[in-house]
Swiss-Prot record:
Name of the protein in its database record: Papaya proteinase 4
Stated role: Thiol protease with a substrate specificity very different from the other thiol proteases.
EC number: 3.4.22.25
Additional remarks: Substitution of the conserved Gly residue by Glu-155 could possibly explain the unusual specificity.
Listed GO biological process terms: proteolysis
Length: 348
């Protein structure tokens, strides 16, 4: 057994050293691999090397690289098997493909505070009537959405979701699209917990009470530090309050999205969500929500309704950083719990 393992390691090292000579063999299709890549260990290693270059991955030694390669193979096997089973959406390689699902959850998902559904707000949006709604809404097309960001190794999804909604309503009300500071919320919203979870509502309340600086003036560093809001100069964007959308109701959420981007929560810990590449997602998730994102539109494709979601895992995940989640009619938590807890900023 030791001889076989040593030989495998030598083969791995050899191909890693010389694999760059044949990277052209790797076909990065829409899912990041081709069926030919699954035919031999050599092809898999070449694919892994190509993937490493694409995502700027570096490992401290050969042992770590071999360990990550084994996880990469397992994820690739899962992706390929699931793509043969599911319809309507598909999985693919992304920057998380060298992480086990447990590692992915630890680094990027975490959980929401237990009392996340019981937070203060100034008004509740209740409108179940979907008859007069626009057939589709996409706030990106209206210039109210900034580029997709990456939260890094910091459970600050709540801050990214809040900032995206404030950026959106500020554009709608003033005509100006500016990038705002997630780091200010991580540092200064004392009702939340920095890189260890937080609240949509209290961060929106912070913006209403204090305003929020531009991202360029208070840049993101993916770790909590002492609040510097009083030392940062330049303009601030301010809102007037916090609104909550009626829970577990499709109509109310669609109506709210038709007016502005909305902060929502989803369950994102599953392997399908980790490896999502495109299509209308409707599979393998429950409603135990653990991740805040931003609803920036809705629509239909192929007869299926969806909510358009902006995530904070960078543009390499999903559909250039977005996911379309299947709509569920009536009173329910929705697919992945997307109807469970939704908030938005009020700006006069």
């Amino acid at each position: 057994m030791a001889i076989i393992c040593s030989f495998s390691k030598l083969l791995f090292v050899a191909i890693c050293l010389f694999g760059h000579m044949s990277l052209s063999y790797c076909d990065f299709s829409i899912v990041g691999y081709s069926q030919d890549d699954l035919t031999s260990t050599e092809r898999l290693i070449q694919l892994f090397n190509s993937w490493m270059l694409k995502h700027n991955k570096n490992y401290k030694n050969v042992d770590e690289k071999l360990y990550r390669f084994e996880i990469f193979k397992d994820n690739l096997k899962y992706i390929d098997e699931r793509n043969k089973m599911i319809n309507g959406y598909w999985l693919g390689l992304n920057e998380f493909s060298d992480l086990s699902n447990d590692e992915f959850k630890e680094k990027y998902v975490g959980s929401l505070p237990e009392d996340y559904t019981n937070q203060p707000y100034d008004e509740e949006f209740v409108n179940e009537d979907i008859v007069d709604l626009p057939e589709s809404v996409d706030w990106r097309a209206k210039g109210a959405v900034t580029p997709v960001k990456h939260q890094g190794y910091c459970e600050s999804c709540w801050a990214f979701s809040t900032v995206a909604t404030v950026e959106g309503i500020n554009k709608i009300k003033t005509g100006n699209l500016v990038e705002l500071s997630e780091q200010e919320l991580v540092d200064c919203d004392k009702q939340s917990y920095g890189c260890n979870r937080g609240y949509q509502s209290t961060s929106l309340q912070y913006v209403a009470q204090n305003g929020i600086h531009l991202r360029a003036k208070y840049p993101y560093i993916a770790k909590q530090q002492t609040c510097r809001a009083n030392q940062v100069g330049g303009p601030k964007v301010k809102t007037n309050g916090v609104g909550r959308v009626q829970s577990n109701n499709e109509g109310s959420l669609l109506n709210a999205i038709a007016h502005q981007p909305v902060s929502v929560v989803v369950e994102s810990a599953g392997r399908d969500f980790q490896n999502y590449k495109g299509g209308i997602f409707e599979g393998s998730c429950g409603t135990k929500v653990d991740h805040a994102v931003t609803a920036v539109g809705y629509g239909k494709s192929g007869g299926k309704g969806y909510i358009l979601i902006k995530n904070s895992w960078g543009p390499g995940w999903g559909e250039n950083g977005y996911i379309r989640i299947r709509r569920a009619s009536g009173n329910s938590p929705g697919v992945c719990g997307v109807y469970r807890s939704s908030y938005y900023p009020i700006k006069n």
